[in-house]
């Protein structure tokens, strides 16, 4: 089975969402009569202000697979609280054998992230972040691990509410 890593493409529709295609794979199903070829696409969609969604789509044609993935990403969007274009705090995300470490960075650092993680932060609106990935480099696992870490992130107000303290006590 051949694998095609598609160049990350960005598209913006009239709804203001940013779309990036992370990968397109050619897949085959072996049946009695031979092989059936198909394509699997992985995409992310974000609004540039902390909302992010991931989708995967499969079809016989590449454009149909990409469209299915984009539609799923739009349906599965989650909100992540950002702080001045970076993350609230250091966070680790895991999915399968993929483990990603994401750290907030000061202004001017830029997005220091590899592969699929960079696409996620760009469509999400994060401008300064430092990341490191360990383990699996499979694009799907890396995207899921990144989203896992981002959804675990808490704001100071949420932490203060859990502990029954004021935000000033939490921030020091």
Swiss-Prot record:
GO terms for cellular component: small ribosomal subunit. PROSITE patterns: RIBOSOMAL_S5 (PS00585), S5_DSRBD (PS50881). Disulfide bonds: none annotated. InterPro entries: Ribosomal_Su5_D2-typ_SF, Ribosomal_uS5, Ribosomal_uS5_bac-type, Ribosomal_uS5_C, Ribosomal_uS5_N, Ribosomal_uS5_N_CS, Ribsml_uS5_D2-typ_fold_subgr. Keywords: Ribonucleoprotein, Ribosomal protein, RNA-binding, rRNA-binding. GO terms for biological process: translation. One of its GO terms (molecular function) is structural constituent of ribosome. Residues 17-80 form the S5 DRBM domain. PANTHER family: MITOCHONDRIAL RIBOSOMAL PROTEIN S5. NCBIfam families: rpsE_bact. Part of the 30S ribosomal subunit. Contacts proteins S4 and S8. With S4 and S12 plays an important role in translational accuracy. Belongs to the universal ribosomal protein uS5 family. The N-terminal domain interacts with the head of the 30S subunit; the C-terminal domain interacts with the body and contacts protein S4. The interaction surface between S4 and S5 is involved in control of translational fidelity. This is Small ribosomal subunit protein uS5. It comes from Cupriavidus metallidurans (strain ATCC 43123 / DSM 2839 / NBRC 102507 / CH34) (Ralstonia metallidurans). The gene is rpsE.
